[in-house]
Design a protein with these regions (language model features):
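Short alpha-helical donor nucleotide-sugar binding micro-motif in glycosyltransferases
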Residues: 121, 129-134
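Short hydrophobic beta-strand element within catalytic cores of glycosyltransferases
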Residues: 159-162
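Aromatic "clamp/platform" in nucleotide-sugar-dependent glycosyltransferases that forms part
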Residues: 142
Length: 236
């Protein structure tokens, strides 16, 4: 099948584009990434992360379901050497849509109560404050077109560790504004986590580049500019 000249197809990033090309390889697909407001310019009450004990906090946010890969993150945390794991804190935020995944997180919290934490829900101001204070966000999704909480981290200059099966992975410059691991492999994720935990100064130094990534791809201004260009090209 072919598209008429008046039909234009857009996707939110390389991961969604690849999925569309798997069934329609001849389609020309433009990139149109959503825009998020600059939450860093807003005022919000501080969210208490004293439970992290001053250690770098690694955060994942999202409903517990197989697609989101919380089990992969759990397994990666378990694979860390004890002396490495205790240098960091880990927070899972999300509603337990899948009981087996919730059980995996609960077991992890029980085994490492001073290191791993779970919150069912945080209010929007709390999420913003969390992103402002955390060291890194982790997205272990098996399939995720463009995870919003990772973008929210970028707004505050926070690097991410993401699966290759995320749209974010296609935009990351490795070691500059984030890290990508492959094959949904907990061992690979554990190795990236270990590096990040042992080099917190590198995470902090990535702040400016992470912020640039937000401004270039995810800001409202970037979205409006891309949409305007696409409309002009379609009607010109």
């Amino acid at each position: 099948k072919t598209l008429g000249s008046n039909v234009h197809v857009c996707a939110v990033g390389s991961h969604a584009t690849a999925a569309m090309h798997s069934v329609r390889p001849d389609f020309s697909i433009e990139q149109l990434i959503y825009g998020l407001p600059d939450y860093a310019q807003e005022s919000f009450p501080p969210y208490d992360i004293s439970y992290a004990g001053g250690r770098p906090l690694f955060v994942t946010v999202g409903s517990f379901e197989p697609r989101k890969g919380q089990d992969i993150f759990c397994n990666a945390i378990r694979l860390l050497k004890p002396e490495v794991r205790q240098k960091a804190a880990f927070l899972f935020v999300g509603k337990a849509a899948d009981k087996s995944l919730k059980n995996a997180v609960d077991a992890l919290v029980e085994d490492y109560p001073d290191t791993v934490f779970y919150r069912k829900r945080l209010e929007r101001p709390e999420i913003k404050s969390l992103m402002d204070q955390c060291a890194c966000v982790v997205c272990a999704s098996r399939d995720d077109p463009m995870p919003t909480f990772v973008t929210e981290g970028l707004i505050f200059g926070k690097p991410s560790i993401v699966s290759e099966h995320t749209g974010t992975a296609g935009l990351i410059t490795e070691g500059v504004d984030g890290f990508v691991y492959k094959d949904d492999d907990p061992d690979q994720l554990a190795k990236v986590l270990e590096h990040a935990i042992l080099h917190p100064e590198q995470l902090a130094a990535m702040k400016a580049d992470c912020r640039k990534m937000y401004e270039k791809y995810y800001s409202n201004e970037a979205y409006v500019a891309t949409l305007t260009r696409l409309v002009n090209e379609s009607t010109g």
